UniProtKB/Swiss-Prot annotation:
PANTHER family: NICOTINAMIDE-NUCLEOTIDE AMIDOHYDROLASE PNCC (PTHR13939), NMN AMIDOHYDROLASE-LIKE PROTEIN YFAY (PTHR13939:SF0). Coiled coil: none annotated. CDD domains: cinA. SMART domains: MoCF_biosynth. InterPro entries: CinA, CinA-like_C, CinA_C, Competence-induced_CinA, MoaB/Mog-like_dom_sf, MoaB/Mog_dom. Disulfide bonds: none annotated. This is CinA-like protein. It comes from Shewanella frigidimarina (strain NCIMB 400). Belongs to the CinA family. It holds the Pfam family MoCF_biosynth.
Length: 424
């Protein structure tokens, strides 16, 4: 089966919005062993849409078309498909009734323009969208089934999961069995990871892939076929052995997700005092439901005054060592932990840039501490100074990893290949 995708919308083509829909579709299908082989983005121009449908349908078996199903004048997908096939639009009575019922149930007055969403190409097969008003549909043109999906991400994901995947499974048969392991790493560059893992002789049917999303690089170990699937655990073990402490999570989308899972399951509590990370450590945990069960509080103590008055940092420490120092973050971590007697506390203080650095403490210098009921662990690292966001996100990742390792009762301070650490 040859799978392609046509993404529509002037705002996507011009870069006004990032096309996360296409990335999600490709990744979701890839994890099922279904590879996207071609993708094109087309603006809101009728001739271009018609040409894209006609041309790509000669090469693909199935095409996901995303966007352009709404009620406004720039939503052209249904009409463009009808023109591409040389047929009329006809009203789908079932969907018109769905629209009328949807607006009634939600106590809203339906603008007449919404009825446009019920007009589909004459040969179209309606695809249900129970979570929205844009009607999905599929049409056969030349060699391909074109499967039209809404641009709203929540609606798209629902339709792909509930409608598209079952359709292609039935239409094209079950794909070869596949399995996937994902390892999240920090402290390595992508090329460094590839060089390190080149030592492994991969069995037939197993492939390695890399996805950089700083501060993490995700390694995907993909196995296709029964024999490769049986060999997958051994290959995963080899990868982890070679990378050592660089692997910080398995089959989790982010390190924050790993920390949330471990804290939620453990019953331990956490408090956070942040300076250079500015609430990032706390915010990423709050994204997860249930974080209130372990997160006591997160404080952004950016100024020296707040470090002293809120956290109880001795002013002499700041005078002697400065805000970006191991003694300061240790005092911050101990102070915030003591407020509510939390099991763990994290603290950060650093120079995110672009200004503020010195010869002794250049931009990218960050001090991080973890306080427990048994002691304090701390380190000061030198991070890449490409942007404030990168310094903050990498600081957050290192802080999370210190906590993760403490929860696992492993060494809290470890060496990362590409992150130098200052001597204490």
């Amino acid at each position: 089966m040859k799978l392609e995708m046509i993404c529509t919308g002037e705002e996507v083509l011009s870069g006004q919005i990032v096309d996360t829909n296409a990335a999600w579709v490709a990744n979701t299908l890839m994890e099922l062993g279904i590879e996207m082989q071609h993708r094109v983005t087309v603006g809101d121009r009728m001739d271009d849409l018609v040409a894209a449908f006609q041309e790509r349908s000669k090469h693909a078996d199935v095409i996901i078309v995303n966007g352009g199903l709404g009620p406004t004048s720039d939503d052209m997908s249904a009409l463009a498909m009808a023109k591409a096939k040389g047929e009329e639009l006809v009203e789908n009575v079932q969907w018109r009734e769905h629209l009328e019922d949807w607006f009634t149930r939600n106590n809203r007055v339906m603008a007449k323009s919404n009825l446009k969403q019920a007009w589909l190409p004459a040969s179209a097969v309606m695809v249900d969208n129970p979570v929205g008003t844009a009607c999905g549909f599929r049409v056969k043109l030349n060699n391909a089934w074109l499967f039209f999906t809404p641009g709203v991400p929540f609606e798209l994901k629902h339709m792909v999961t509930e409608q598209f995947i079952p359709f292609i499974t039935e239409e094209f048969g079950v794909q070869e069995k596949s399995a996937l392991e994902k390892l999240l790493t920090i402290g390595h560059g992508e090329s460094s990871l590839a060089d390190t893992l080149s030592e492994i002789t991969l069995p037939a049917g197993i492939e390695l892939g890399y996805r950089s999303s700083m501060p993490h690089i995700e390694i995907k170990i993909f196995a296709r076929g029964d024999k490769a699937i049986r060999q997958l655990p051994d290959v995963t073990k080899q990868v982890k052995a070679l990378l050592g402490c660089a692997v910080v999570a398995e089959n989790r989308p982010t390190l924050a997700a790993e920390i949330h899972h471990r804290l939620y399951q453990s019953g331990f509590s956490l408090s956070v005092a942040e300076s250079c990370t500015g609430g990032m450590i706390t915010s990423q945990l709050i994204d997860f439901a249930g974080s209130s069960s372990y997160l006591h509080h997160g404080l952004v103590t950016y100024s020296n005054e707040s470090k002293v008055k809120v956290l109880g940092v001795n002013p002499q420490i700041l005078d002697d060592h400065g805000a970006v120092s191991i003694p300061t973050v240790e005092a911050m971590a101990q102070g915030v932990r003591g407020i509510l007697d939390s099991d763990f506390a994290l603290a950060t203080s650093g120079i995110a840039g672009p200004d503020g650095g010195s010869d002794d403490k250049p931009v990218g210098t960050v001090a991080i501490a973890l306080a427990t009921k048994h002691g304090v662990y701390s380190q000061m690292v030198k991070l890449p100074k490409r942007s404030r966001q990168l310094v903050r996100s990498m600081s957050t990742a290192i802080a999370y990893d210190m906590l993760r390792r403490a929860l696992l009762e492993e060494a809290v301070i470890v060496d990362y290949p590409s992150i130098p650490r200052f001597a204490k």
